[in-house]
Curated annotation (Swiss-Prot):
Organism name: Aliarcobacter butzleri (strain RM4018)
Protein's pathway: Cofactor biosynthesis; biotin biosynthesis; biotin from 7,8-diaminononanoate: step 2/2
Signal peptide (residue range): none
GO MF term set: 2 iron, 2 sulfur cluster binding; 4 iron, 4 sulfur cluster binding; biotin synthase activity; iron ion binding
EC number of the protein: 2.8.1.6
Record-level GO BP terms: biotin biosynthetic process
Reactions this protein catalyses: (4R,5S)-dethiobiotin + (sulfur carrier)-SH + 2 reduced [2Fe-2S]-[ferredoxin] + 2 S-adenosyl-L-methionine = (sulfur carrier)-H + biotin + 2 5'-deoxyadenosine + 2 L-methionine + 2 oxidized [2Fe-2S]-[ferredoxin]
Cofactor: how and how many bound: Binds 1 [4Fe-4S] cluster. The cluster is coordinated with 3 cysteines and an exchangeable S-adenosyl-L-methionine. Binds 1 [2Fe-2S] cluster. The cluster is coordinated with 3 cysteines and 1 arginine.
Family: Belongs to the radical SAM superfamily. Biotin synthase family.
Protein name, per record: Biotin synthase
Enzyme class at the top of the EC tree: transferase
């Protein structure tokens, strides 16, 4: 990857707010009654239109995200049909799926339908995971990441800072991510919501910048993507993340929160002298 290239990725929340897990950081859990938009299936035509818009906004990747524990037969079929439609309409965008815990066989099926990359975040350290989720295990998540690689998919796995974890937890998570040798690593910062058990993100802006730098030290060759919580965490200094080692951004809206206008990101990145990457594998 070129030192001067910045990679942009967009996400589509194709099934929202229907998850029965108890992840304390996530408004998509039905357990917390957060005031978000909830729906079972987004129309595939709408997903295709979002993909077209994402590519027009210079995104090289487009992620199909479903709320829920993992893939069942109906959800797998839906994601595959969506992938087929997007691939046909926007063949030059790299397709990513983020559908929770998945088996090797399910991931092979996604690959058959044009999915190139599977996103499944470790979220935090193994030893801290029970503090933020009790309905599935960290080991379940790690195994899914291994399954994705075994199925021949590129792996995208990262985590969230600001959940109350210790510095030792952060280092442990980064070491675990590095052990998986992913292609890309999304770094999220907890976005508080009054409905969630986690009350606030204790990180300062400087601590967050230092964590980006720390992540890069453990992941020297990966696409390091700043994702959820970027605007809230960094404000007007958000593009300084590149000085600390990041080389990718999620553009547009996030799963349940609004993002910055994509053109504003493009203008800011190019004004700093960076080049927007045209493909994931440059």
């Amino acid at each position: 990857m070129s030192d001067n290239k910045i990679y942009l990725c967009a996400i589509s929340n194709i099934e929202s707010g229907t998850c029965n897990e108890d992840c304390k950081f996530c408004t998509q859990s039905v357990k917390y009654k957060a005031d978000i938009e909830r729906y079972r299936r987004k129309e595939i035509e709408d997903i295709v239109n979002e993909a077209k818009k994402a590519r027009a906004n210079k995104a090289v990747g487009f992620c199909l995200v479903t709320a829920g524990t993992g893939l069942d037969d109906k959800r797998l079929d839906y994601v595959c049909r969506a992938a087929d439609a997007v691939h046909k309409a926007v063949p030059d965008i790299s397709l990513i799926a983020c559908n929770g815990i998945a088996s090797y066989e399910q991931l092979k099926e996604l690959k058959k339908h044009g999915i190139e990359n599977y996103n499944h975040n470790l979220e935090t350290a193994r030893e801290f995971y029970n503090e933020i989720c009790t309905t599935h295990s960290w080991d379940d998540r790690y195994e899914t990441c291994l399954n994705a690689k075994k199925a021949g998919l590129y792996l995208c796995t990262g985590g969230i800072f600001g959940l109350g974890e210790t510095q030792e937890n952060r280092i442990s998570m980064l070491k675990s991510i590095a052990s998986l040798e992913p292609m890309s690593v999304p770094i999220n910062f907890f976005h508080p919501n009054d409905a969630l058990p986690l009350v606030k993100n204790p990180l300062t802006k400087q601590e967050a910048f230092d964590l980006v730098k720390l992540a890069r030290s453990y992941l020297p060759n990966q696409m390091l993507m700043i994702a959820g919580g970027r605007e809230l965490m960094f404000g007007e200094e958000q593009y300084d993340v590149f000085k600390h080692g990041a080389n990718a951004l999620v553009v547009g809206d996030y799963l349940t929160t609004g993002g910055r206008d994509a053109q504003d990101d493009i203008d800011a990145v190019t004004a700093l002298g960076y080049e927007i990457a045209f493909a994931c594998h440059q």
